[in-house]
Amino acid sequence: MFIDSAKIYVKAGDGGKGCVSFRHEKFVPKGGPDGGDGGTGGSIFVKADANLATLLDFRYQRHYKAERGEHGQGSRKTGRSAKDVIIKVPVGTIVKDSETGEPLADLVYAGQEVLIAKGGHGGKGNQHFATPTNRAPRYSEPAGVGEERNIDLELKLLADIGLVGFPNAGKSTLISTISAARPKIANYPFTTLEPNLGIVRYAEYQSFVVADIPGIIEGASEGKGLGLKFLKHIERTKVLAILIPADTEDVQAEYDTLIEELRKFDESLCLKPRIVVLSKMDLVLEDASFEVPAFEGEKVVQISSVTGTGLQELKDVLWRIIQESNQQEESIT
């Protein structure tokens, strides 16, 4: 099961109390204050883990609390600070405050770690409050309270290529052919009910990631079909591969509808590099009337996942576009 959103509650630890204490030593009848400071409460962090792929674990554990710091002690002993809590999430997770909607973290690379709830500071012991007029203070500083908040987690797939097409366009077949991914495949719409990731080995030490996005239908930008739930995953891809079956009734109309749904959802998607992939070419080889539409001058690659025709060309084209996209990103940064 692919879980792409979750809600959790986090509570950082309170600080330890400062100590009120006085020296008790032989031959020192009126020892001064020696109350130690309290320890710091544990903070809570989120950390991106490349070994995680879903937010499923958060269905079973929704509350995360860090321990408080230990209280200060006499003889100027500082209380021990509490350990921090690290919450591991998949790469690509966005973290927001549930009440305010404030973005707290966008975890885009493995090992990235962000503080989401800070532990309370330890209270100062009475040793800090002695003055010439009050040499025996009988008070200490209160401990700080650890932050608490409700958190929204949202996972958006990180992939180089996003396969976009109507249900039953052949996306799952293609990704299973060019990568090691094994998505469920059947001859009916909406077989893919969750995004699949496949790693395509292009050459030695060279590879790229393809996301098989569940099928879009007309009205998806308004929530129809699988709708908005999966359109958002396209936002994180570098390149869009518009997959259209060559045997569809009106190839150009299908292309126009897909582009329009992307535009309605987010116009910036139409600015991404993209190519058109005509799939199932083996079904129209003997159709003399078949013509490849212009597709507004887009690069078109004709393939058949069944016969293997055009697959190497497709990988070559995708690899080249990815490299061009990476170079553009580097020049901007």
From Swiss-Prot:
Residues 159-323 form the OBG-type G domain. One of its GO terms (molecular function) is GTPase activity. It is found in: Cytoplasm. Keywords: Cytoplasm, GTP-binding, Hydrolase, Magnesium, Metal-binding, Nucleotide-binding. InterPro entries: G_OBG, GTP-bd, GTP-bd_Obg/CgtA, GTP1-OBG_CS, GTP1_OBG_dom, GTP1_OBG_dom_sf, OBG_GTPase, P-loop_NTPase. One of its GO terms (biological process) is ribosome biogenesis. Mg(2+) binds at residues 172, 192. Residues 1-158 form the Obg domain. Signal peptide: none annotated. CDD domains: Obg (cd01898). SUPFAM superfamilies: Obg GTP-binding protein N-terminal domain, P-loop containing nucleoside triphosphate hydrolases. GO terms for cellular component: cytoplasm. It comes from the Bacteria. Its main location: cytoplasm. It is an enzyme of class 3 (hydrolase). Belongs to the TRAFAC class OBG-HflX-like GTPase superfamily. OBG GTPase family. An essential GTPase which binds GTP, GDP and possibly (p)ppGpp with moderate affinity, with high nucleotide exchange rates and a fairly low GTP hydrolysis rate. Plays a role in control of the cell cycle, stress response, ribosome biogenesis and in those bacteria that undergo differentiation, in morphogenesis control. This is GTPase Obg. It comes from Chloroherpeton thalassium (strain ATCC 35110 / GB-78). The lineage of its organism: Bacteria, Pseudomonadati, Chlorobiota, Chlorobiia, Chlorobiales.
